[in-house]
């Protein structure tokens, strides 16, 4: 299995003021899946995405990425995993405003120590993939919102990630631009085989994904989602679960 989460919990704070954002979540994601992670604000979906992207750590439980225990990695090792295998797309684009599209896409490759000529070649190829061939010398602050998100996608795929995390990728876009972005993500998944997890609250955008997982109050809500998307419970993946409220899913 590509990704396995076993009885994952996340608690912020201590004592009476502690808040449990995740309450024993178990989930499997197969290689090549395109999963929409849905739920209301405060349901735990963003916390779950941060853990999957190695941007945060679980309080307890086990996270296996390609059979590697992420919980057992130190901070530097998690950073290496994130840098080499995971791509990120954010709602706010997170581009350098006065930097060209090409330079923005090159940035993660620069951090990986790739030579300039090779960086530019990969960045140009990535921009072409998202329909921005010929736009490489435009600064990002001169681009439309849809174009900026395309640059962000090109940057995310430039390092050829195994796993792409998209956090509300259409949140700042109108319907037309949102559909364009979703078609690109769908193409990356179906044609390039990139496994994608997308956080969204929009059911219209979730329809582009192949599977849905709904969160509610720190657990997977098994009463929602498409038939066959959520199977089993936490005992399927973690027999020693001690949290009676734990929910689980299998994609």
Report each predicted region and the residues it spans:
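ABC-family P-loop ATPase nucleotide-binding domain
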Residues: 1-11, 222-251
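ABC family nucleotide-binding domain
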Residues: 2-215
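H-loop (His-switch) and adjacent beta-strand-loop-beta switch element
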Residues: 212-225
């Amino acid at each position: 299995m590509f990704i396995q989460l076993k009885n994952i919990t996340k608690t912020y704070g201590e004592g009476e003021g502690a808040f449990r954002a995740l309450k024993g979540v178990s989930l499997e994601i197969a290689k090549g899946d395109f999963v929409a992670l849905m739920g209301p604000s405060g349901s735990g979906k963003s916390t779950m995405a941060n853990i999957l992207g190695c941007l945060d750590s679980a309080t307890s439980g086990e996270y296996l990425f390609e059979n590697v225990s992420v919980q057992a990695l130190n901070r530097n090792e998690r950073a290496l995993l994130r840098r080499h295998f995971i791509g990120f797309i954010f709602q706010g684009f997170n581009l350098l405003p006065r930097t060209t599209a090409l330079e923005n896409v090159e940035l993660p490759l620069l951090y990986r120590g790739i030579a300039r000529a090779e960086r530019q070649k990969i960045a140009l190829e990535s921009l072409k993939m998202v329909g921005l061939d010929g736009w490489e010398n435009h600064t990002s602050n001169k681009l439309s919102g849809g174009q900026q998100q395309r640059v962000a996608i090109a940057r995310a795929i430039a390092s050829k990630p195994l796993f792409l995390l998209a956090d509300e990728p259409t949140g700042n876009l109108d319907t037309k631009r949102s559909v364009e972005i979703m078609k690109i993500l769908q193409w990356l998944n179906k044609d390039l085989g990139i496994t994608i997890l997308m956080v969204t609250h929009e059911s219209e955008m979730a329809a582009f994904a192949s599977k849905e997982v709904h969160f509610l109050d720190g657990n997977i809500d098994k009463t929602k989602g498409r038939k066959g998307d959520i199977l089993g419970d936490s005992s399927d993946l973690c027999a020693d679960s001690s949290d009676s409220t734990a929910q689980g899913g299998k994609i």
